[in-house]
Amino acid sequence: MRQFAKPTIVVSKCLEFDACRYNGEMIPDVTIRNLQPFVTFIPVCPEVEIGLGTPRETIRIVEENGMNRLVQPSTREDVTEKMEQFSNDFLQTISDVDGFILKNRSPSCGTRDVKIYSGFEKAPAKGKGAGLFGGAVVKNFSHLPIEEEGRLSNFIIREHFFTRLFTIAYYKMIKHNKNMKDLVSFQSDNKYLFMAYNQVKQKELGRIIANHKNEKIEVVFENYEKTLYELFMRAPRYTSNVNVCEHIFGYFKTKLKKQEKDHFIELLQKYAEKKIPLSSLLTILKSWAIRFDEKYLLRQTYFEPYPEALVEISDSGKGRDY
């Protein structure tokens, strides 16, 4: 069974933790509930932290003279400076965080799709952007997994978020010990996961570890970390997953019956046609790794990039995009 590091996640406090929304309610969230045994959460409500209280009159972002201001229409109070100060102060205290889950469309926590109004009260929305706190998070931590709770209901987005989160947290644990042997093992165990994400960056990581320039170990880890973040900037394409599955399949070609090989090739085609999920292929490949005792493959994180308990039953049986 894989061992995982325990990531630290900043989360909007109104999601599953506290009844601190403007209307005095809490928002139940199954993803956050499922994550709780596996991560350390840092709940925060920026609006409460700047003294707005619960319940409270709503706030909104208003564009004024080309600048976004955070205001409370009912009181005409401008809380922009308070929110900016809190955001800066708070984010400076969490340098070792691994990711963020923030409330979508919130004028404080939202990272996208937050309505920006042309004026107070009944003025129409003129565009969309980030909330003040959410925008500060993206500005300071763009290299980390940052998501809104609404988007995490999408399997592809959720899987990408979880994969980045748990891989980065494990890397940080290795980085803390500054042990090259551990870094080499990390690279080896993640070979096929990294290949699925970005084969160019995967090879670049290998060259960094080879350290032909005899850089100091601190420089090696610094360069490795920067490239690792770049590797995870987008989710794998289905063509990359097909390529990785074909590489793994190559371990068994001389050991399988013709019918088994033909069946797997048919499944690869069905995956490419969006008829079956990637998990159907990985289950078969892992069963062969067990059957033929391929120890190198059994260490590959590609088969379980995050705790299996976080895979929801509703995710199974879906097509290629899942």
Predicted regions and their residues:
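Short, hydrophobic/glycine-enriched beta-strand segments
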Residues: 8-15
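Short beta-strand segments
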Residues: 12, 45, 101-105
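N-terminal glycine-rich anion-binding loop in soluble enzyme alpha/beta folds
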Residues: 19-20, 24-69
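Short alpha-helical segments and helix-capping/turn motifs at coil-helix boundaries
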Residues: 25-30, 84-90, 132
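A charged helix-plus-loop insertion that forms the helical arch/lid used to bind
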Residues: 60-77, 116-127
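Glycine-rich anion/phosphate-binding loops
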Residues: 75-95
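Internal, conserved structured core segments that host functional sites
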Residues: 92-174
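Acidic, Ser/Pro/Thr-rich low-complexity regulatory regions
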Residues: 144-322
